[in-house]
Amino acid sequence: CNTIVKRNNKWIGYNTDAEGFHNSLLEFLGTKNLKRWKVAIIGAGGAARAIAYVVKKLKGKACIFNRTLSKAKSLAQEYGFDYAPLSSESLSKLELYSSLIIQSTSIGLGVGEKEISTPENDPLSFYNFKGYEYVYDVIYHPQVTPILNRAQMSGCKTINGFNMLKYQGYKQFELFTGVKYEDS
């Protein structure tokens, strides 16, 4: 829950992650479904849960990669997805699920822009981008994380989490005011 609204003297909690991600993803990819996409979801926390929900809703096939395998397994089983450890031992599986790579961990948050990629600031430091991948990092500050920098240098289409945040804000505005926000 990231938004609380009082309705009829009761507090109701909402999570706007899924809607924010959904709208920004459709805008990024220019498609309304993921039927032909094999998606790697990096991480298994709260943002990953919303992302998995959206990927399933859009009929995508996904694999959840996480450092703690039990968390990856739990989230993957909830949505009927594959799962694997987030490490170089899963490289072949990552390559199978690499048409869209969604980075949802906090790794890379707060590092300097254009900082050299290391395992401490890039969860996929072991992966060599081929240039065909679409790479989405939910982090919006810095604007270019080490993973996005490497992906861009390889010719991948990339996006950070700013539009997800923007669409979450639109939904929160609607929840608070009862008026749908119109982007001008």
Where do the protein language model's features map onto the residues?
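Phosphate/diphosphate ligand-binding glycine-rich loop within oxidoreductases
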Residues: 1-31
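Glycine-rich adenosine-cofactor-binding loop
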Residues: 15, 25, 35-56, 66
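Short, well-ordered alpha-helices that flank and scaffold nucleotide-derived cofactor binding pockets
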Residues: 23, 27, 53-57, 77, ...
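Rossmann-like adenosine-cofactor binding region
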Residues: 82-158
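Short helix-loop-beta connector
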Residues: 31-38, 130-131
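Adenosine-phosphate binding glycine-rich loop
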Residues: 36, 133-184
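NAD(P)-binding Rossmann-fold cofactor-contacting core
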Residues: 58-79
